[in-house]
């Protein structure tokens, strides 16, 4: 909004001219989302506590230390969604189609997550909305987004870029739509599975969003994309502002979500954040890089899949003491804070590996 209002005056005012730069607006987005989180956090937490008598249901078969979390409210992802969307509406170019497509997906996945959290709180169990129903809704939203990109996007939308290789792209044809849906839905659920400890998912999400802030900026810049031999996709630079807002809102949320958490982001936050990262990776044609940068989410998801299939194949045996993987280490006696910090370190390593693919070709 501010960008569009100030655009006619960029040549007459130094202040207005600053808004012409994506980097300035991105930095401002971080400041705004952080500030909004600090201001609205206590109010939202108090409101959620008044509505949720028992807070988020805690699994009885989980680590014993988790019973101390009883009564902690969920749906804190509302804070992240509101602050990120407000900063994007204020600072991004509202004539940019990618801005609106991404916001649509972000909010839609947030609504699905809210429905799931609401079902858990009202039923007082950790099951919520049926898994198949959630997958169906996620698939429908992802399909709509892919169709919008297919008909509104003039970029090479069927190409899958392979990182670390020069000019290597696979043309998936119309199968790319199926692949893109898988990326978006998979990303959404992978983040959801990772969000099991205080602050565990928040920092890796911030690292991933920060990485895609850089990727969006480079892909949307003709000079930088040519220099790095990336597929140039005009106008994706505006997604940098949204990604920066995600970084700020996640860091602001971490203030209240650090152990011991005052609030959980819930599926409202995890499904929406995972979904929006998947959408941005599809738009920027860096789907495989998302799997690298978000390697922690991939590992957590793989641990669940392996556990389930091995359990069925062996009729009751398990690979891990408990899945997802972070619970396995808790069962081994690791303190929650140790698991969280070590997983943060792993996520930093994955982010650096993913970003190195931009240059190593």
UniProtKB/Swiss-Prot annotation:
Membrane association type: Multi-pass membrane protein
A GO CC annotation given for this chain: plasma membrane
Name of one Pfam family that matches: Glycos_transf_4
Cofactor(s) this protein requires: Mg(2+)
GO MF terms, alphabetically ordered: metal ion binding; phospho-N-acetylmuramoyl-pentapeptide-transferase activity; UDP-N-acetylmuramoyl-L-alanyl-D-glutamyl-meso-2,6-diaminopimelyl-D-alanyl-D-alanine:undecaprenyl-phosphate transferase activity
Pathway: Cell wall biogenesis; peptidoglycan biosynthesis
Coarse class of the protein's main subcellular location: membrane
PROSITE patterns in alphabetical order: MRAY_1, MRAY_2
Compartment annotation: Cell inner membrane
Catalytic activity, reaction form: UDP-N-acetyl-alpha-D-muramoyl-L-alanyl-gamma-D-glutamyl-meso-2,6-diaminopimeloyl-D-alanyl-D-alanine + di-trans,octa-cis-undecaprenyl phosphate = di-trans,octa-cis-undecaprenyl diphospho-N-acetyl-alpha-D-muramoyl-L-alanyl-D-glutamyl-meso-2,6-diaminopimeloyl-D-alanyl-D-alanine + UMP
InterPro entries: Glycosyl_transferase_4, PNAcMuramoyl-5peptid_Trfase, PNAcMuramoyl-5peptid_Trfase_CS
Enzyme category, top tier: transferase
Transmembrane segments: 28-48, 74-94, 99-119, 133-153, 168-188, 203-223, 236-256, 263-283, 288-308, 338-358
A GO BP annotation: regulation of cell shape
Enzyme Commission code(s) on record: 2.7.8.13
The entry's keywords: Cell cycle, Cell division, Cell inner membrane, Cell membrane, Cell shape, Cell wall biogenesis/degradation, Magnesium, Membrane, Metal-binding, Peptidoglycan synthesis, Transferase, Transmembrane, Transmembrane helix
Role this protein plays: Catalyzes the initial step of the lipid cycle reactions in the biosynthesis of the cell wall peptidoglycan: transfers peptidoglycan precursor phospho-MurNAc-pentapeptide from UDP-MurNAc-pentapeptide onto the lipid carrier undecaprenyl phosphate, yielding undecaprenyl-pyrophosphoryl-MurNAc-pentapeptide, known as lipid I.
Family to which the UniProt record says this protein belongs: Belongs to the glycosyltransferase 4 family. MraY subfamily.
Entry protein name: Phospho-N-acetylmuramoyl-pentapeptide-transferase
Protein's organism: Rickettsia massiliae (strain Mtu5)
Gene designation per UniProt: mraY
């Amino acid at each position: 909004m501010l960008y569009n209002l100030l655009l006619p005056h960029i040549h007459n005012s130094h202040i207005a001219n600053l808004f012409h730069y994506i980097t300035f607006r991105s930095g401002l987005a971080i400041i705004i989302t952080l500030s909004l989180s600090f201001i609205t956090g206590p109010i939202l937490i108090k409101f959620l506590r008044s509505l949720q008598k028992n807070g988020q249901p805690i699994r009885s078969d989980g680590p014993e230390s988790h019973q101390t979390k009883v009564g902690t409210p969920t749906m804190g992802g509302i804070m992240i969604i509101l602050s990120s969307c407000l900063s994007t509406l204020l600072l991004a170019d509202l004539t940019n189609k990618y801005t609106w497509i991404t916001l649509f997906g972000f909010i839609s996945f947030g609504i699905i997550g809210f429905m799931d959290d609401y079902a858990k709180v009202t039923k007082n169990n950790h099951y919520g909305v049926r898994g198949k129903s959630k997958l169906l809704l996620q698939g429908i939203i992802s399909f709509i987004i892919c169709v919008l990109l297919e008909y509104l996007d003039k970029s090479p939308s069927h190409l899958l870029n392979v990182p670390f290789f020069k000019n290597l792209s696979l043309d998936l044809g119309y199968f790319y739509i199926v692949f893109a849906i898988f990326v978006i839905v998979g990303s959404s659920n992978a983040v959801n599975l990772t969000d099991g400890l205080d602050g565990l998912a928040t920092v890796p999400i911030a690292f991933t969003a920060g990485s895609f802030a850089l990727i969006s900026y480079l892909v949307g810049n003709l000079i930088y994309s040519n220099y790095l031999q990336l597929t140039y996709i005009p106008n994706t630079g505006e997604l940098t502002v949204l990604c920066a807002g995600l970084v700020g809102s996640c860091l602001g949320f971490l203030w209240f979500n650090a152990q011991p958490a005052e609030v959980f982001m819930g599926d409202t936050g995890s499904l929406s954040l995972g979904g929006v990262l998947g959408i941005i990776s599809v738009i920027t044609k860096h789907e495989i890089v998302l799997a690298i940068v978000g390697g922690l989410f991939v590992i957590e998801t793989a641990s669940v899949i392996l556990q389930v299939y091995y359990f069925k194949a062996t009729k009751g045996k398990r690979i891990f003491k408990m899945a997802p993987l972070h619970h396995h280490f808790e069962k081994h006696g690791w303190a929650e804070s140790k698991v969280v910090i070590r997983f943060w370190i792993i996520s930093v390593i994955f982010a650096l590996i993913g970003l190195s693919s931009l240059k190593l070709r």
